[in-house]
Amino acid sequence: EQLNLPIDQLRLFGKSTIGSVIKFAGRKLEVKKIDDANFKDLDYVIFSAGSEVASKFCKKAVSDGAFVIDMSSHFRYDENVPLIIPEINGDELSNIDKPSIIANPNCSTAQLLMVLKPIHDMCKITSVDVATYQAVSGTGKAATQELYNQIYIKEGYEDQNIYPKQIAFNVI
């Protein structure tokens, strides 16, 4: 809304929010079921619903003719999907055929690169050592449930094995 972009259509899709109404630019928009999504006639589709949704629907959106921006981790290691941080390599967007998919890097990576790029432009950084600590919630609802179970439920539950080792009280 703040950018006042020329938006003819805005479709909202979800799973747990189906039927919810969102106000945008003076319009009331209802969240529709993503399983029934039709991406035809959409120029851009932004996915910010996790890797499972991205794996199911991003390629469908591209085949329907849309340019897809995926915010999940699903395509981050796919060499055919460019990672784009507009302030860093946004100029590469002009070289990407549409319809297509672009992805964004991990949030820690994006923030770090925003700081390092101007320094690199001045004096060519050759190496950086970084340690980050990511939230369990970034892995999804099943991971947060596993963490909860490991902390509060002492017996009678079965681990989902989202992580290779116990996540509660641990750094992995």
Segments and roles (model prediction):
Residues 1-167:
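N-terminal Rossmann-like NAD(P) cofactor-binding subdomain of oxidoreductases
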